[in-house]
Amino acid sequence: CKCFFNDTNNVVYLTIPSASELLFHETGHALHLYSVPPMLLVPFDYAEIVKRVRQNPKTLIAVENFVKEYKKITDNIEEKFRQKADKIYDDFLNDKEYRKRIKKTLSNLIDDKKEKYKDLQIPEKQLNMIISEMYTEEEYINCQKRIFINENTESNMRTYYGGLLAICDIIDAIYEGKLSNGLLVNAQGKKIDSTSGHGIQYYHRNVKITFSEIIANFAAIVKLPDAEENLQILKNIVGEEMYNMINNFYCQDILKLHIEELDGIKSYGGKR
């Protein structure tokens, strides 16, 4: 993980240079736990408001429309890096030294897998055939291309569209991870395309975790470029009631308390 918040010691760790979106998100977690008393980490009316949002058919329509636009962006970025990957690896395949390295890598992989699977008591000839078909030069190149495309697409999204990623995860939290797991359906029962997000397994843990992610994502949106536009997009999707609950909690319960802490420090000449 490039950037994460440790809630046992309230420290944000940045392991390597990371995207601003990640840093602002994890700092949002820290502010949430630092500024708000444990018993007030979730608004008292959170469950009721979220329930109304989920039951509102207009919200689902807004989510589906947003996801369609989001997918256009990600698909265009993926296609750009797919074309780049094709060119890079086509050039590599014309390099004799690179081809030799691939063959050596594949040979080592095949030997490792033979050793790993020998206890399955598969006849040696059959095992060799299975493993050799799994680890071909073509599959190795395709795998490297997929890694290149996925990593660069994610990096590009976090750098230039971090606010949209945060919106996706807020929606994912509201629908308990169904969006990112591809299980959210529209009024006609058709699946809505999946987006980034923490997923069902994470969001089924408890309400505090879910709301903490909503606040952390909101904090990231506020700090990132195009904040005003992205906040309006979020408001149009989740509705005024849900948006106001998040915004009021962030501005009043978190930032207000944090300012009071700073004022307290100032009144003591910078010392506690």
Feature names for model-found ranges:
Residues 1-272:
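Active-site-flanking segments in enzyme catalytic domains
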